[in-house]
Design a protein with these regions (language model features):
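Conserved N-terminal catalytic core of the sugar/cofactor nucleotidyltransferase
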Residues: 2-5, 13, 19, 27-106, ...
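A structural signal for short hydrophobic beta-strand segments in well-ordered beta-sheet cores
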Residues: 25, 144-147, 198, 209
Length: 244
């Protein structure tokens, strides 16, 4: 299976650490963050990771000149200008010739999600897309995703006020998508998957949420980036860091 890994952002919330370095190339314990992300994909049968690159693509290409990471083939898709999340997904997937269902992962999220179970759920429900959802205490910082009893997404509410959130289950940044989703995304300009693409698919009843209370950390801020270091040192995933 192939995966698009979103790594093109500027990492502004991690400055000054990211002034000259993409956040996915910052160290997490003993290796760059991207190696944890791609290593997790490898553990679940992904054989190609398509990196959607924007800021400082040279840092990635110089670090992995043979285009392999954690035993996974890397394909580089370098944006000429920022395309936002949906635009980046379309650009990377079409550049690599993706024509079967594929994964999308946020490159700054560390998780022990069972990706095989997510894919099985997606295949069983027959939608166009399936999102990994996790519960959080404060959903106001995230995309909130209420679902019905069958897992069908009822709405996609991006960063609502805490007292107005329809659920505490949020978008955890790992998706299974059918290639037809790419046709929904404008071929040029900035398009947000959270604010435009997913709400449109949900409105047609074709988007599902897979609820799983996994380990999960969005490393995009200084506190959460540091927390990831402590978590891996403490082996909160239940395994030694080398086997994450």
């Amino acid at each position: 299976m192939r995966a698009v890994v979103l790594v093109g952002g500027f990492g502004t919330r991690l400055r000054p650490l990211t002034l000259g370095t993409p956040k996915q190339m910052l160290p997490v314990v003993d290796r760059p963050m991207i190696e944890w992300v791609v290593g997790h994909l490898a553990d679940h049968g992904v054989d190609e990771a398509i990196l959607s690159l924007g800021f400082r693509p040279d840092v990635f290409t110089e670090a992995y000149p043979d285009q392999t990471c954690a035993g996974v083939k890397l394909t580089y898709a370098v944006e000429d200008e920022p395309l936002d999340t949906a635009g980046a997904i379309r650009f990377a997937a079409t550049s690599a010739g993706v024509d079967e269902r594929f994964l999308v992962v946020n490159g700054d999220v560390l998780t022990d999600l069972d990706i095989g179970a997510l894919v099985d759920f997606h295949d069983a429900h027959g939608g166009e897309g399936t999102l990994h959802l996790i519960p959080v205490e404060d959903p106001s910082r995230y995309g909130v995703v209420p679902t019905d009893d069958g897992g069908r997404v009822q709405a996609f509410v991006e960063k609502p006020p805490a007292d107005e959130a329809p659920s505490n289950w949020i978008n955890a940044g790992t998706y299974v998508l059918e290639p037809s989703v790419l046709e929904r995304i404008a071929p040029e300009g900035r398009v947000s998957v959270e604010r435009e693409t997913f709400p449109a698919i949900a409105a047609e009843g074709r988007l599902y949420g897979y609820e799983a209370e996994t380990y999960w950390v969005d490393t995009g801020t200084i506190p959460t980036y540091l927390q990831a270091q402590f978590d891996l040192v403490d082996c909160v995933l239940g395994t030694a860091p080398a086997s994450f």
